[in-house]
Swiss-Prot record:
Protein name, as recorded: 3-dehydroquinate dehydratase
Keyword DNA damage: no
EC number: 4.2.1.10
Organism, as annotated: Mycolicibacterium paratuberculosis (strain ATCC BAA-968 / K-10) (Mycobacterium paratuberculosis)
Site entry: Transition state stabilizer: R17
């Protein structure tokens, strides 16, 4: 099974941007961790990051068309993008929303997610391990 792992705005800056909040793992290191865990679980992970909402929408539309599960950390678009929510609602395979930090323990504006109502589940505040937990969940589910 192919799993789309999609990271949104500013996540390409992991390891440099607010390491006290997001840790010191870079996006390249995160991608390698995800790909290794996916392979160990018999999955193939396609890990992508973009600061462009349009590109994220294209990737989610592609996953919907291919009936592929998605692990999505939409970054700040989680709290602002109805368009991203609508694209995610089109998915028939599972959607797991992931956030590295505990968004519920941060600023008030981060506590609302447009994605959670259309997601299968959400993993927040467990650092980069959240992605690996999402993969383990998907490995136990048929797509």
């Amino acid at each position: 099974m192919i799993v789309q792992v999609i990271n949104g705005p500013n996540l390409g800056r992991l390891g440099r941007r607010e390491p006290d909040v997001y840790g010191d793992t870079t996006h390249d290191q995160l991608a390698a961790l995800i790909e290794a865990e996916a392979a160990a679980l018999g999955l193939k992970a396609i890990v992508r990051q973009s600061d462009s909402e349009a590109e994220l929408l294209d990737w989610i539309h592609g996953a919907a068309d291919a009936n592929q599960p998605v692990i999505l950390n939409a970054g700040g678009l989680t709290h602002t993008s109805v368009a991203l929510r609508d694209a995610c609602a089109e998915l028939s395979a599972p959607l797991i929303e992931v956030h590295i930090s505990n968004v519920h323990a941060r600023e008030e504006f981060r506590r609302h997610s447009y994605l959670s109502p259309v997601a299968t589940g959400a993993i927040v505040g467990l650092g980069v391990q959240g992605y690996l937990l999402a993969l383990r969940y998907l490995a136990g589910r048929p797509a």
